[in-house]
Amino acid sequence: MFPENKMLLIAGPCVIEDNSVFETARRLKEIVAPYASSVHWIFKSSYDKANRSSVHNYRGPGLKLGLQTLAKIKEELDVEILTDVHSPDEAREAAKVCDIIQVPAFLCRQTDLLVTAGETQAIVNIKKGQFLSPWEMQGPIDKVLSTGNNKIILTERGCSFGYNNLVSDMRSIEVLRRFGFPVVFDGTHSVQLPGALHSQSGGQTEFIPVLTRSAIAAGVQGLFIETHPNPSSALSDAASMLSLKDLERLLPAWVQLFTYIQEMDAVSV
């Protein structure tokens, strides 16, 4: 699906807020451009955040307008697109525009959603639920494979640890790798403190650098990073998104470490 010698970088804002998403996408392309030989960038954003903590929180522009926006970004920037879906009907519509459709962590056991996502023949990114062990991902994988679609990505995004907390177990990455599909580490949702702010999730972005480096060292194919020009003003996941400025600062180390691990793996084979 992707060049194995390139680090996947699935990056973009949590949700489409307004037309500023175009400028964010353009800026991301500029940031990644110097690393074109080492990084495979995929733009991500959501048209609907269907699992917000509060009914009063912003969800997004909706399916129709959101997919229109993503289609324009895809055409203008010549970039692959990922978005998340929440029902079989949404999966069918999103696959008409997006190269990758994502099954959210909370929905990763929903059989109808997984099967329909597979039937679209798009690449399917399955996010491991916070409530699942890595071994239990065999079930979601089998549901997609039952459609004849083997284009699967597995994303680790942390595991529930008591109330309002997540931990990242790097052993999970090795377990997921053994399924034989590309494994991605979600460096921003992994630092969330779910429900810690009552009507929304908190976050500890200061741990993004160490967790992303650890995941690369553990052997992931890429990183999933939600990013925003000014996270503090973001309409969703403000407490856990990485600023574009910080992404630009961290990217060189990610690429260097990924390249080193690839070289070490080649020697050890």
Curated annotation (Swiss-Prot):
Known pathway: Carbohydrate biosynthesis; 3-deoxy-D-manno-octulosonate biosynthesis; 3-deoxy-D-manno-octulosonate from D-ribulose 5-phosphate: step 2/3; Bacterial outer membrane biogenesis; lipopolysaccharide biosynthesis
The entry's keywords: Cytoplasm, Lipopolysaccharide biosynthesis, Transferase
A Pfam short name: DAHP_synth_1
One example of a Gene Ontology biological process annotation: keto-3-deoxy-D-manno-octulosonic acid biosynthetic process
The keyword Ligase is assigned to this record: no
The reaction(s) this protein catalyses: D-arabinose 5-phosphate + phosphoenolpyruvate + H2O = 3-deoxy-alpha-D-manno-2-octulosonate-8-phosphate + phosphate
Gene Ontology molecular function, alphabetical: 3-deoxy-8-phosphooctulonate synthase activity
GO cellular component: cytosol
Principal localisation: cytoplasm
Compartments reported by the entry: Cytoplasm
EC number: 2.5.1.55
Matches recorded under InterPro entries: Aldolase_TIM, DAHP1/KDSA, KDO8P_synthase
NCBIfam families attached to this UniProt entry: KDO8P_synth, PRK05198.1
Protein family according to the UniProt entry: Belongs to the KdsA family.
Protein's name according to its UniProt entry: 2-dehydro-3-deoxyphosphooctonate aldolase
Native species: Chlamydia trachomatis serovar D (strain ATCC VR-885 / DSM 19411 / UW-3/Cx)
Gene designation: kdsA
